[in-house]
C-alpha cells in the first residue's frame, strides 16, 4: 500500500559535490523519512553516509561548501537554500566526539547555550534546561564541569543541548564510538526512551549494527559509494548478503546460524537474538555444528615479558585509580584490557609507559625493573597508541608524522623512507602519504598514529581503542595486521570497548572495575559470565544468548568454536 503521510525529510534526485572534489560524493539520492520513524543509516567508511547526514543538518553546503542538485526538504524547509541557523531549529545533531560539542563551562551552561543565543528570559531558560536535563537523566550534574563527566554523561549533555530547541529530528553521528559496552547499551536505550516520549524522528549513523539493534529500528538505509543500495526493514536486510558484500558486519548470532546451515528469512525475524525464530530443526543444526566443530588447540605457557606486581596509583591522595594490581603478560601474547570508562585501564598503560609514577608496586619488562627507565628508554621497547589521535599528532603531513620517531635513530634518510613507506602500506595509508593530516577522517588519523608507533619495531605495543571509528573492513585490516605482527613475536595489548575485537583476537582478557583487576580469564569465559559482565560494564555476546536458547553447554566453548571457525572462513576469503 503506498505511503500517504508527508515525509519530514525528502531527497529527490539529490546529488552533492564538495567544492574541492572533481566527482560528487552523493549520487541521485531518493529517500523519504517519515515523522516518528527511527532509521539507521549504515555504510563503510567513505560510503557517503556522513555526507548524507551533513546535508540534512546543513553542515553541507553551509560549513563545507559544495554543489547541490535535485531537491532536499527538511521539515518543510528547502535545506540547500536555507541556512545552518534555520536548520538547527529543526535538526538536533549529537556528534561522534562529545568533547567537540561542549561550549559551556558547566553542564547547565552547555545545555542552555541555544536558549541564551535566542535571548530566552532567565526563569524560562532555567526551567527548560532543567526539563531537558531530566529527560536525559543528567539533572543532578548541572554544576559539573565537562572534565568531571564520563563519556556517556557527556553524550547525554550533548543530547540535552539539542533537545532544548524542541527539534523534530534528532541525528546521532556514531553514538557508540567512544562508549564502553554497557554505556553504549544505555545510550541506545536512552535514544529509544527519548523517541517514545517525544515522538521525534531519529536518524542514527553507525556501522555497529548489532549494538544499534539492541532496540528496534524501523528501517536500515545501506549506503555505499554515494548511493543508496538498500532501504529495508532489519529482518529483510539481515536475511540477505548485502551487508557482508558492503563491508558491514552482520550480528554474530546471524553468522553462527548461517554456519550451521540454517536458512535465514524475514519470517524468522533475525533482527534480535532474543526473538529470532528457531524451530526444533534449527536448534538441532546448531547443536550438530557445535559437536562437529573442533576446539582451537591450546598453546603452551609463554615466557614472561611484562610483569606487574602490586601496582597502586592515585591522581590525588584520596583518589585510588588503581589498587594492588598484579598480572603477567607473556612474550607473543595478544591480550585485551576491558572495563567501564574510568576503571583505570588507560592509567595502567600510562604507568607501564612511564607517563605516570606508581605510588607503590613494581613493573618488570623482560626481567628488568623499569623504575629507573625514563619515557624515552621505555619507548624503545614499548609502543603506545593513544585513544584520541589528535593528542598524538604533531606534524602537518602524514609522511612526516610517521617518520618523526625515527629521527635521531641512526638510520639514513633512504632507510627511514623505506621503513615509513612499508609501514604506510600495511596500514593502508600509502596512497595518502603526501596528504596533510587535516584532510583525514578520525579513523584515518587513528591509523596514522598506529603507523607512527609500529614504524619503530617495539617488542610490546599497547593500543588504546585501536579500532575506534573504523568500519568492518578497516577494522579487519588493522587487526589482521596486528595479528601478523603478533605472529612474528610482537606482544600486543589492547584497551578496548569492542567485544567483537576482544573475542576474535585476544584469547585472554583482563577485566577491571573501580581500579581493581577482577578477572584474568579467556575472553569467551568473561563474556559468558553475567555477573562479571555487569560488574565490568561489558556486554554479553549474542553467541552466549544463542547457545543458551539452544541448550548448548558450556556456552563459552560454543563461543570459542565459533570464533575459530569464523577466522578460518574469513582467512579463506569466503
Residue ranges and their predicted role:
Residues 42-44, 338-340:
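The feature captures the beta-strand-to-loop junction immediately N-terminal to the Walker
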Residues 57, 353:
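Helix-to-loop junction immediately C-terminal to a conserved catalytic motif
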Residues 65-77, 361-369, 378:
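Conserved ABC transporter NBD signature motif
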Residues 123-141, 414-432:
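Conserved ABC ATPase "signature" region
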Residues 145-149, 153, 436-440:
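Conserved ABC ATPase signature
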Residues 170-173, 461-464:
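Catalytic Walker B motif of ABC-type/P-loop ATPase nucleotide-binding domains
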Residues 227-253, 516-543:
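Conserved beta-strand-loop-alpha-helix hinge in the C-terminal portion
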Amino acid at each position: 500500500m503506498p505511503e500517504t503521510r508527508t515525509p519530514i525529510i525528502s531527497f529527490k534526485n539529490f546529488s552533492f559535490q564538495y567544492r574541492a572534489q572533481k566527482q560528487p560524493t552523493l549520487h541521485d539520492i531518493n529517500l523519504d523519512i517519515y515523522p516518528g520513524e527511527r532509521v539507521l543509516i549504515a555504510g563503510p567508511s567513505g560510503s557517503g553516509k556522513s555526507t548524507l547526514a551533513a546535508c540534512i543538518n546543513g553542515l553541507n553546503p553551509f560549513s563545507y561548501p559544495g554543489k547541490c542538485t535535485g531537491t532536499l526538504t527538511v521539515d518543510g524547509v528547502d535545506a540547500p537554500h536555507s541556512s545552518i541557523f534555520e536548520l538547527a531549529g529543526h535538526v538536533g545533531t549529537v556528534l561522534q566526539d562529545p568533547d567537540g560539542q561542549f561550549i559551556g563551562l558547566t553542564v547547565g551552561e552547555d545545555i542552555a547555550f541555544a536558549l541564551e543565543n535566542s535571548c530566552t528570559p532567565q526563569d524560562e531558560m532555567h526551567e527548560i534546561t532543567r526539563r531537558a536535563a531530566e529527560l536525559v537523566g543528567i539533572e543532578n550534574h548541572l554544576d559539573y564541569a565537562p572534565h568531571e563527566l564520563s563519556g556517556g554523561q557527556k553524550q547525554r549533555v550533548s543530547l540535552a543541548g539539542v533537545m532544548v530547541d524542541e527539534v523534530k529530528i534528532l541525528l546521532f553521528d556514531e553514538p557508540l564510538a567512544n562508549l564502553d559496552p554497557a554505556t553504549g547499551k544505555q545510550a541506545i536505550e536512552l535514544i529509544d526512551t527519548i523517541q517514545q516520549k517525544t515522538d521525534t524522528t531519529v536518524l542514527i549513523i553507525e556501522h555497529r549494527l548489532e549494538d544499534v539493534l539492541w532496540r528496534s529500528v524501523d528501517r536500515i538505509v545501506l549506503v555505499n559509494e554515494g548511493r543508496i543500495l538498500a532501504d529495508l526493514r532489519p529482518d529483510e536486510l539481515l536475511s540477505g548478503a548485502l551487508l557482508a558484500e558492503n563491508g558491514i558486519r552482520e550480528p554474530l548470532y546471524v553468522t553462527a546460524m548461517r554456519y550451521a546451515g540454517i536458512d535465514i528469512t524475514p519470517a524468522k525475524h533475525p533482527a534480535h537474538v532474543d526473538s529470532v525464530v528457531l524451530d526444533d530443526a534449527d536448534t538441532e543444526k546448531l547443536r550438530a555444528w557445535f559437536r562437529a566443530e573442533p576446539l582451537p588447540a591450546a598453546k603452551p605457557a609463554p615466557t614472561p615479558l611484562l610483569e606487574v606486581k602490586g601496582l597502586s596509583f592515585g591522581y590525588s591522595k584520596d583518589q585510588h585509580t588503581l589498587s594492588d594490581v598484579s598480572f603477567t603478560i607473556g612474550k607473543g601474547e595478544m591480550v585485551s584490557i576491558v572495563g567501564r570508562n574510568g576503571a583505570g585501564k588507560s592509567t595502567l598503560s600510562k604507568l607501564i609507559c612511564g607517563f605516570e609514577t606508581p605510588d607503590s608496586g613494581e613493573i618488570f619488562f623482560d626481567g628488568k625493573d623499569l623504575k629507573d627507565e625514563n619515557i624515552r628508554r621505555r619507548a624503545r621497547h614499548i609502543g603506545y597508541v593513544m585513544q584520541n589521535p589528535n593528542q598524538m599528532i604533531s606534524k602537518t603531513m602524514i609522511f612526516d608524522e610517521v617518520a618523526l620517531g625515527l629521527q635521531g635513530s641512526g638510520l639514513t634518510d633512504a632507510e627511514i623512507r623505506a621503513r615509513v613507506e612499508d609501514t604506510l602500506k600495511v596500514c593502508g595509508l600509502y596512497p595518502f602519504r603526501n596528504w596533510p593530516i587535516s584532510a583525514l577522517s578520525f579513523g584515518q588519523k587513528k591509523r596514522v598514529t598506529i603507523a607512527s608507533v609500529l614504524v619503530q619495531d617495539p617488542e610490546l605495543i599497547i593500543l588504546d581503542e585501536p579500532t575506534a571509528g573504523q568500519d568492518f573492513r578497516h577494522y579487519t585490516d588493522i587487526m589482521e595486521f596486528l595479528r601478523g605482527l603478533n605472529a612474528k613475536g610482537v606482544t600486543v595489548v589492547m584497551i578496548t570497548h569492542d567485544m567483537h575485537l576482544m573475542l576474535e583476537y585476544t584469547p585472554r582478557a583482563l577485566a577491571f572495575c573501580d581500579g581493581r583487576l577482577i578477572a584474568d580469564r579467556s575472553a569467551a569465559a568473561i563474556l559468558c559470565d553475567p555477573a562479571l559482565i555487569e560488574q565490568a560494564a561489558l556486554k554479553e555476546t549474542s553467541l552466549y544468548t544463542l547457545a543458551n536458547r539452544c541448550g548448548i553447554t558450556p556456552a563459552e566453548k560454543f563461543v570459542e568454536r565459533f570464533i575459530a571457525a569464523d577466522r578460518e572462513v574469513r582467512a579463506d576469503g569466503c
